[in-house]
């Protein structure tokens, strides 16, 4: 540092080593000084170039400066200013073209760089006079150059996006400071400023700098060119150029603005000087302008007109903008940018359709950069955006104020989807139309829209823009890909740091626990069992202690530890039960008991039920009774081993939860080990009996791949939203075992047990300040604490008998028994919630006494168990009096159990008095514990029993606050009750076990009545409690129900209902005790944050109690009429009431029963009496659709009650039903047992279901709710939320002939329209067959129109296929010429399933069980699957889903997505290998061949499940599934196949029909073959919604529109999102416009010719004498005519039968030919052209007549071979020569002949290359060619107006027909032909030098006058 001065230092460049040492010493000195001067010392080092190869100099720079100044600054100095951008770039070196990585830092007007960011010394560059430009033109290496007056750097970025970011940052760093630092304004800096955008390029001709006017240096004129305005400059002059680039806005026009008198602004010309294109012509004088010698003349950047300097003043002021005027946004129309970041636009006059262009600079062959620049040259630069740089949002924001505009996306399908998604975000569907230019690889959407497969040439963009201007509009369906992803554990931040030793110890403990659990489950040795049990308890205790030490303050972990201890106690209980019979009194029992005593949780504060000091619980004798009931149920006949396995798995899951909670950051491999090992270790062998066991893993015969372990994140299961228990085949048994959804924990399970140490207190403050304690509990079914006799044991029981005694509670206090803590089978799922109890609420409680009677439970041995009285604590319960229970009701403080099989003396069967076997309804319901939390009601009658209270829970005493009955303005709804809410929360299996009803869905149940032959009576359920002689009243005639029925029958009390309140109910009992139930209603709940159900959703109503009995509700339950074949009808209301109401009754009969069409009989003023009179023929019968009620509840007097008209079944039983508004009835009359099939509700009679179908419960916890695809949509929704069909009309009055007597499926189904308000018919669904109704009943329905879609079409329940085929046959017979509309055809058929799925090689989903259980007893959603997808899905159906993306083209899962994903990864890894479309296709082929060998997606059918419109589709062995929206897949493959058969069941595919095509992919060979062969066997279905369930725990590749990713397990729903306007190519319109423009052009030419006499006289004077070249063409013409005359005469002589007039024509042509060369000498002067007219006419007539004769008689002529050849050649030559001749009428009125002078030296060769004569004769193309041949002259004006056909003819005459296709493709007309240069010909494919010279010479000859 001795050479360093204080201010500056000038040093000659030293060798590398010495300079390094100098720098290092400088750094050390700077570091040692310790102080920094406030004024930075910036050394300036002047360096000479004497061999330093590290300094960067661009190899492109042709004018390097001799001396560059290098400035260096220290790190602390350049840190003072704000950094605009920094990062690594590659810097080009001078030697060997090398690149070196350097770290750059950009600041205001300064650029610094060094080797890395930690360097202390940076080289700095002053950017005050900066010039920067892109080095490449094809986006090859993303390099750009920076030039300043002192430095020049060539830098390279990793991607074009990064390069453009640096260029934009350089603009920001050098731009002047603006007061507002708005990011949007920064983005608009390029648009609003007129700065040039330079790039380095070379030129083929001399080019001159627009700044210094000197020629660009080098042979190739290398320099910089602006990509917008084509301004040319030297690199050294770029910084000096003025900002006069192409205008963008009105402000950029500046002083050139021209304003008219009326205030309107005219678009002026924007001139650029010099460097004009080849053969430019002055727009004023029509002479050539431009020069290669100097910079002269002007060109307009908008209209592309060129003028001389002298002619420019004569040019029109207004600029016509050019050929793309319709698409250009004139800069004078864009005034400013408004506050909402959109242009303030003033639309120009005339036609205006602005075009917004998005170009992806990376698409396809990397042609995007060329198109980007070309579009900026043709349009306003502010209309063109690079998707890579700015994305679509900027352009859409700017165009927001345009009323209508078009969007052109120049890219592949992925970018099109990106733009469409942004259009969705801005909601601009109605104001924009989208077109696609195929620049990508696949370009499927562009193919379908008609824009071709590729567009690589930007030369003819003006013509391409014209095509987009004439395009037509079509609607493109867009589909939402809704994803419900399974929660997969991800590493989180650890809560405690455990060292490697501690982690190993923790893992060892878990492994040891698993080892001991395995021994406990599998061993039969007592000593091993004792040892393993002790060791397990010690290990668990040690594990809990160690983890608790690190988490003393973690309450959630403490709870999990207590859960683990409780599960361990339950395991010990199970061991005790298992061993107590065989090893009573031995060491094992003693050991287990000691361990139980030792393992009881000792932390009272962590137990939820101990947090409330006033409440504790102990199991009572009721638990033993429940245990016995469960043990006796069919589904729980499992061995103790299986119960023990469940307990062991439960312990393992609890251990996993504890470890996972303590170590959330543990590696994924360890989590996988913990989650998968338990079931692998503890799974027992399959039960040989074939019965479904509740604890084994219910896997199918072929287990799916990578099933998700049920042990994963078990704690999340407590958050499952309340779901019905109905299950479908479409969900995997282990699917979604761990989900985390916002729902109340107490609603997670549908089973609530009584013996639960859990009290959930919810303080309801809505009803007069009264407090209601609601207790709910969940329990596990697994045989825990149950002995061999089926009795439930208490934890400390010694095997003695507990005899319950009768006990009466004559005070209000309900005892809650306390005692030792109870081991609970599902305590880990117990919600640990504590609710504080307010003291003032307790004081407000008013006591009301309750008599609670415990019935005697008689054991099998006759002994009466004794009940042990325990401690009690009293809870004040307001307003309820309970009377003694019936004998079959068991009540406790927390639960009431109704034993439906108990023998009661007061109840007998209403149909049979005989005794019989017991039918356990609880066992029929499920393998779960059926228990319901007791609910306390206000102001009940003292005479009511507990059974009455529970049975009348639907008496509207306790409802949702959203319900209409809670409103002060409305009446209560019939049937709306707490029972419905509880049923949706707890599951219908439990709640309707009390009524012996099983529901088909949580929202849709059909009130049913079953009439069968007499059977032995079963034990009565409580649902028949009040139907016997002792209890004559129905349960709905109890006091609360009486009031309801009184209002229902009154006109003064209209009812309310909404669509969400419609429910269906099916009575599935096999006994003959039938009971008509009123319809169930459900309401919507309110939600609080997190989608939890709000407490205020429940509300008590103070209803007036009516104690009087309603006689109207008494009517016979059955009426046996076995011989009555007529219709027994109920009385009806008046006609005017029925005219405003319609409802539905569905009747299901036996298979053998036939459907009878019943006609309604109108009988007004009849009151609920059975009518036996036969029905009368009503008026005009109409086929009425099913009426679905609107979503909005009705109010007030708009609804009147009515009584439905019900038919009598053919079985003889009269279906008696009273329907109020809102009732839907169904009567099941099949003789066989009908039971809803579910894992929780197996059939009573159909036992074979259990083997194959009862496997939708979870393997480790069958009571825990699992999801299925349809019900998962109800997550986070109201407990009583119903499935709604969106409002829309699907009603249509059908032809009466279609309503035939026909039974469908296994049932006879009849539908009756009964009651519905006519003004609320928002949604209607068509069901066939329909029953005629009188017109007066439906005043408004007949006018509604809609689709013909069937409600059950596509469902497996009813076989409507033959109905559809019958209708199809009928339509074909009725009128074959009549074409059905696509909408009717679509809605009539969908979903269309391929019949091949029913072949033996496709798997059958109907194996095992009966058709009834799988179809009728499935969800109501299945029945409505064909209707609801037609509508927009309700938001509640998609709760829990999120939109992953939007599909426009196709969706693929499996092998195709795997190939796309591999290609994407390859392109990201090696982008240089994927820059060509051909290379991309090659990579696709290679990756597809790779899949042919690897088969990574093999057995995909085991990993996914497919549903189409709600119908499960069986899948064969396949590797992929493709769902098509457009008929093009992965690069133009018609994967669906073309439909050629007339009897094809599928609809023709289209992208605007709202229909998806589902296709199976069997392998890569099929994908390759589908490009060549029309394959159809792989079709699966056509539908309107698709659901795919991904099973297992591995991700599966998925692609949407070519964009692929890995999708985790979950559910995918494809639903219709919206439609967007797309521009399709309209070729017919293009041809019409082209022909019209051609006519206009010809007309203008004729006008100009008539007007310009001087030009015509000049033409006449020059054309009088035939030139030398024309003379040569004339000789060839004479030769051709002579030859043709000769051979035609010879033909006539050889065949005298031919016409002799042809011989005369030949002689006349010969004479005319002789007249132009008398005595062998051609005429001279003007007379020759006049004589030639006669020769041309006669020779043309001879040619035409000869061709006509040969065409007519050629098939019968037998010519000599030589004659045929010579005649063909003569005719061909004659045709070619005639094309060169033209006859024109001159000014003097005479006709003269002219010849086209076209390369006469090679005319003979050209004739030989023409098409064969006979081919032209047979195709008839000769006449067609003649009509397009306009008259031609040798003048430039004529050639300038040539069409494409004439240019092609011109090429053929030059024997250059090989270039015809290229000229046609590029639409080369006469105007373009005259301006073609060498470079243009090269672009057109003319590469041969000789051909180029000939074409250029011919063009020159055409241009000469």
UniProtKB/Swiss-Prot annotation:
A zinc finger (Phorbol-ester/DAG-type) spans 195-245, 268-319. Residues 23-37 have a biased composition (Low complexity). GO terms for biological process: glycerolipid metabolic process; phospholipase C-activating G protein-coupled receptor signaling pathway. Transmembrane segments: none annotated. The lineage of its organism: Eukaryota, Metazoa, Ecdysozoa, Arthropoda, Hexapoda. It holds the Pfam family DAGK_cat. InterPro entries: ATP-NAD_kinase_N, C1-like_sf, DGK, DGKD_4H, Diacylglycerol_kin_accessory, Diacylglycerol_kinase_cat_dom, NAD/diacylglycerol_kinase_sf, PE/DAG-bd. It catalyses: a 1,2-diacyl-sn-glycerol + ATP = a 1,2-diacyl-sn-glycero-3-phosphate + ADP + H(+). It comes from Drosophila simulans (Fruit fly). Gene3D superfamilies: 2.60.200.40, 3.30.60.20, Pleckstrin-homology domain (PH domain)/Phosphotyrosine-binding domain (PTB), Probable inorganic polyphosphate/atp-NAD kinase, domain 1, Transcription Factor, Ets-1. Residues 1842-1905 form the SAM domain. It is found in: Cytoplasm. This is Diacylglycerol kinase eta. Belongs to the eukaryotic diacylglycerol kinase family. Residues 82-175 form the PH domain. Residues 350-486 form the DAGKc domain.
